[in-house]
Every structure is written in C-alpha cells, then in structure tokens.
Amino acid sequence: MSVIKDMNIIKTIRTHSEAINSLLICKNGNLVSASLGKIIFYDKKNLDVILRITEFKQFYISHIIELHKDNTFLFCHNGFLVFETSEDNKKYKILYSFYERFVFYKSIEFDYMNKINSEINYSIIISSTYGINIFDSGKNEDMKTGWSSIKTLNNNESVYNIFKLDNETFISTSNSTLAGGNNCLRFWSYENYTNIKTINNLTCSPGTSSIVKYNERILLVSLEKITYFGTKNLPNEVNNINGIAVLDLKYLEVVQYIEMPNKIRSLLLTKNNTILAGSVFNVYQFKFNKGNFDIISEKELFNYINNIIVEFEENCFVIGSINKLIFVLR
C-alpha cells in the first residue's frame, strides 16, 4: 500500500500558463495535460514534452479523452474537437470539429450493438451548461464523418460531470451554482436514456474527476458542501460541510459522508485499492475499513488547489493544479 506521507515530489512540471483542467494517461503510457488553449503530450519515460498543441487558443479545454481508436482524442470546449496523433504522439492532425453556443464540460464514450446489422457502434455523451448531449458516431472508422447529434437530455439544469458506471448505466451531476437548475445526482440508462433515479440536494464538486467507483457496491462523490441527506442512516439536515458522499449502488442511496476540512476537487482509486482525494490544501489517502472509509495519511502540497489526480504507474501519481503546476509524487 502506498503511503502519501512518505512520498516526495520528484518532479514539478511548469508547462502551462493556466489552470490544469484535465490529465490523461494514454493507452501507450504517455501523459497528456490540458488547459485553456493548450494540450501537451509527455513521454512516459521521463515526462519530457514531446508535443505541444497551442492552436486552440480560443478554446477553454475542460476535458480530454482517448477514443476507442488508438491515438485518437476528443476534447470539450464550446463543442468538441477530434484529432489523431502519430503512434509516438509527436505529430497530430484535426479530424472533426463541432461547435455549439454553450459550454461542453466532460465526455464519455460507450459502445453498443447496432440492432439492424449487429455491428459495434459508438456514441459520445457530453455534459454541458444545457444538459446532456448525445452524439452517435456509428462505426466511424475514419473518425471524420458520421458524427450526429441524436438527443439532448435537459432538466433545466447545468450538468458538469458525467461518469460511466458500467455498460448499462451512467451518472450525471448538476450544480445550480454554475448556470441554474438543481443540485442533484442522476442515474441514467444507456439503452433508452431514461432517468433511473435522482438523488436531490447533493452539491457535487465541479471537477471532472469528482466521482469514483470503489467496487461493485460503493460509489464515492466529492461534494462542494453537504446540505441534506434524509436517508434512514443519516441526519435529515447537515449544512455547509465539505466532504465526500458514499453511495450504496445496490439501493442507489447515500449511506455515509466523510467530513473534510477543505473542499475535495478530485478522487482517484489507486491500483492498490486505496482512494486519493485532492483538496484545496492537501492530498488525502483513504482506506476502506469495516464498512467505512478512514483517512490513513495526508500530504500537504504547498496550498495548491489539486484539481485532478491520475496514477502514472504504480505508486507514482500525477496531480494537476488550478495554480498551473503539475506535481509528480512517488
């Protein structure tokens, strides 16, 4: 088990002039970071810069993913853009771009069986200030054509985060402090895009990594504040508490909350089955113990807001900060 208090910052990367909004470990092991108008690829051996993309200066790049096709990436802005790189990620070209009048935040890709021809097709689900936007890309072998908007799920609320729970279900979180609507978490069906259940009055953190699935039974969601629970195991009102909600996936309800001294912006399930949580001041490590998550260690990171955490390799973590820096801990 890694112990954060014994870790050292082995590298500080100063490649961005704006907040780090997204980090990604590519399928080939290289690292990608994204901020306002800038995407940077780093070599997996020593984290040296191998590709710097700066032509998207007008885009607020909120999230980047690698699609089912290797070395093909999609990032969100006022719409989304698809590009591919060479196998070593040192060259790139744009494949497709879609623009919208509102802001796109986070995207997930899922595959499904086409009932007509029994082929595997792909769709992209994207959260936005206008709700949830679904694009069907069909087989989309060249990634240049076939993209079509097929549905928008809108409950008069801004949806910041979405999370792929399994092959049948995804989750969305809405935050009224962003652009109106409810503070809630919703479970959705992939098959027909119906709302399975809504948990109201959860003010979820706006970060794109604020949800993590611990196992088949437990889901963790970081909260801006805890305002109301109303389950049989918790008090009816708990006001203005920063922390993490623990959800039981069998019953789809909150069963525990972990009160924290600061707002939690990011969550990560590590390869050794502990949870890392990035806050305004610290990175915390949790362990599941007798039905509860207990803090077992913490690491102060110079008062930087830790926006997103990825595991670069076992016991080596990369943390992206709102304060423009990237830290590597081992």
What do these predicted ranges mean?
Residues M1-R330:
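WD40-repeat beta-propeller superdomains and closely related acidic/aromatic-rich repeat-like regions
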